[in-house]
UniProtKB/Swiss-Prot annotation:
GO biological processes: neuropeptide signaling pathway
Function in brief: FMRFamides and FMRFamide-like peptides are neuropeptides.
Protein name per the record: FMRFamide-like neuropeptide GDNFMRF-amide
Top-rank lineage group of the source organism: Eukaryota
GO cellular component labels: extracellular region
Subcellular location: Secreted
Expression (tissue specificity): Expressed in the CNS but not in the ring gland, midgut, thoracic perisymapthetic organs (tPSO) or abdominal perisymapthetic organs (aPSO) (at protein level).
Keyword Secreted: yes
Residue(s) carrying Phenylalanine amide: 7
Keyword Secreted: yes
Record key words, sorted: Amidation, Neuropeptide, Secreted
Amino acid sequence: GDNFMRF
């Protein structure tokens, strides 16, 4: 999966 801007 994507891990962009995951906070």
